[in-house]
Amino acid sequence: MKLQKPKGTQDILPAESAKWQYVEGFAREIFKRYNYAEVRTPIFEHYEVISRSVGDTTDIVTKEMYDFYDKGDRHITLRPEGTAPVVRSYVENKLFAPEVQKPSKFYYMGPMFRYERPQAGRLRQFHQIGVECFGSSNPATDVXTIVMAAHFLKEIGIQGVKLHLNTLGNPESRAAYRQALIDYLTPLKETLSKDSQRRLEENPLRVLDSKEKEDKVAVENAPSILDFLDEESQAHFDAVRQMLENLGVDYIIDTNMVRGLDYYNHTIFEFITEIEGNDLTVCAGGRYDGLVAYFGGPETAGFGFGLGVERLLLILEKQGVALPIENALDVYIAVLGDGANVKALELVQALRQQGFKAERDYLNRKLKAQFKSADVFATKTLITLGESEVESGQVTVKNNQTREEVQVSLETISQNFSEIFEKLGFYTQ
């Protein structure tokens, strides 16, 4: 058997992982500005954590979950999304306690797992960055979180992003709308796709979100959730819209947007951009005020979003956005002869301990091959160290871009390379 990675997974090699590290680091910096702190949860959870919160009738639970019984006969699932595990952690660790500052703001990043057809930007193991805010029902929390997502997408370079906005109202409004939707769709049941015929019985709102052509035709004249909002739900949505307008954030009301998870209420949103004629969702989320109580905690408001890293990187690539990744070496030491081997090891270590990104040759190659490696590494400065340099204690340091050279002692390099680095036109941080 030829050993290969499983279908729907990928190896993220060094050239690509640099982009991943940049995106993750960039997200951390943005989230810190909004006072979010990182939380890390297990990649597997008890099956009920996901099935009960995400919804027993959702595609995630019925079709896409990786679940199994472990050796202790416990029903386990690999996490398919990030919110339910974070809510479980919030409740289990009693972060709702009075002494914990509210609202509680968390972000997470890591792998998720769904058994679905692999395609560009959507794999069976995919990576998600997300945030969750607990303890505030203020519409300003909805807006601040949406604006944070917009801030991240704009600063990282995503172009042509449009904010799609909707509300699912409170449970009473949602129940009234659900019944109206059933009444509307039932006479059209035979025209719906097989999946939507099933959804009509279990979760009719999901029919609105279907990508099947026959379903899109069926819901063209469906009733709007906006006509079923009670006073509380209408006031919340109006406040969100007004605050977005106050901040100069454009949005599109999309009454057919429902999101794929059952726990949402009130505000839901997606950031969508067009790639090669197709609309791609790059970030999505909303409010989920009942989820903490569902996990056994007190009634606690919640709001959050998630975005897929693979899809984000795909969009950046398609839009021609080059991430500002610094891969250059500060110093490369070309080593000539066995007599310079030990000194080269001492020197490269001294440079690293001073904070420089440094490398040396280990393969006893000809100088031409070593200089080629220095160019491949986009090296800023080049040192050639042979037995004669070791004996004299003097060496030439070359700017590998301008070819300017300075003669210095090995002792100076070991103790204060910053001075030489700057003399050759480079600056230390």
From Swiss-Prot:
Localization: Cytoplasm
This protein's UniProt keywords: Aminoacyl-tRNA synthetase, ATP-binding, Cytoplasm, Ligase, Nucleotide-binding, Protein biosynthesis
Main localisation: cytoplasm
Gene Ontology biological process terms in this record: histidyl-tRNA aminoacylation
Organism for this UniProt entry: Streptococcus pneumoniae serotype 19F (strain G54)
The protein, known as: Histidine--tRNA ligase
NCBIfam families: hisS
PANTHER family cross-referenced by the UniProt entry: HISTIDINE--TRNA LIGASE, MITOCHONDRIAL-RELATED (PTHR43707:SF1), HISTIDYL-TRNA SYNTHETASE (PTHR43707)
Enzyme class: ligase
GO molecular function, a single term: transferase activity
Family from the record: Belongs to the class-II aminoacyl-tRNA synthetase family.
Annotated PROSITE patterns: AA_TRNA_LIGASE_II
